[in-house]
Amino acid sequence: MTPILSLRGVSRTFRSPRGEVVALRDVDLDVREGEFVTVVGPSGCGKSTLLNLMVGLMEPTRGELLYRGRPSRGINRDIGYVTQADNLFPWRTALQNVSFGLDMRRIGTSAERRDRARRLLARVGLAGFENHYRHELSGGMRQRVNIVRTLAYEPKLILLDEPFGPLDAQTRLQLQDLLLTLWGERPGTTLVFITHDLTEAIALGDRVVVMSARPGRVREVVPVDLTRPRDIFSIHTDARFRAIYDRVWAHLAEEMKEAV
């Protein structure tokens, strides 16, 4: 089966008056349709740059990116992107934020778009908060709105750049559990998820991509052979989880030493 997304020898160099910085070098990666891929690596290894290339916010300096087997250039509107900052429009209510992507794509009637947004908010525990503005929502609530805003128009590939990074530990666990549930309800949806948290990467992913120190490349891809559905609150007690964690950490620790 053709991967939904492929990177072939992708490199990205940033140029400035002070010289060149090679963020990524010769990245080869296939992402299969319907899988959950997590990405870890030392700070500054180009993880966010990788997602920006995937969605088309920037072009590779060298190499090729394929979407469903065809060269992809420019912004790919088939791909959803959830950032660490919630980026909610402060002048729009939660309901209006969720319906934004539907409005831009003119999906359904206005009433149908509002109804879908309302149902999604209820699905993530925000019934009754439809008319609240960003400043009236907690950080966890904002990120729930941010996630379902992307899910609303049903992209087949969703990129997530440390979406739970700023949140407290308990809220992170709750949203990890919610994300797995929402993904499980959408067969065929593919997720690529960046995180600094190895426990999060293993608990969520089908595979963990370990990036090298800058310039970033794929050092190792570690399969996560844990059954689904997963209990996010207890999976870390599984002996198999510990073995996978140790394997991922061994690769990452070496790269962190290189980055110092």
Set out the residue ranges of the language-model regions:
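The feature captures the beta-strand-to-loop junction immediately N-terminal to the Walker
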Residues: 40-42
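Conserved signature/switch motifs of ABC ATPase nucleotide-binding domains
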Residues: 132-135, 153
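A short, flexible loop at the N-terminus of ABC-type nucleotide-binding domains that lies
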Residues: 1-4, 13-26
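Conserved ABC ATPase "signature" region
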Residues: 103, 110-129, 180-181
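Helix-to-loop junction immediately C-terminal to a conserved catalytic motif
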Residues: 55
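Helical segment within the ABC ATPase nucleotide-binding domain
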Residues: 172-187
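Short coil-to-helix segment of the ABC ATPase nucleotide-binding domain corresponding to the Q-loop/switch region
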Residues: 92-100
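Conserved ABC transporter NBD signature motif
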Residues: 63-75
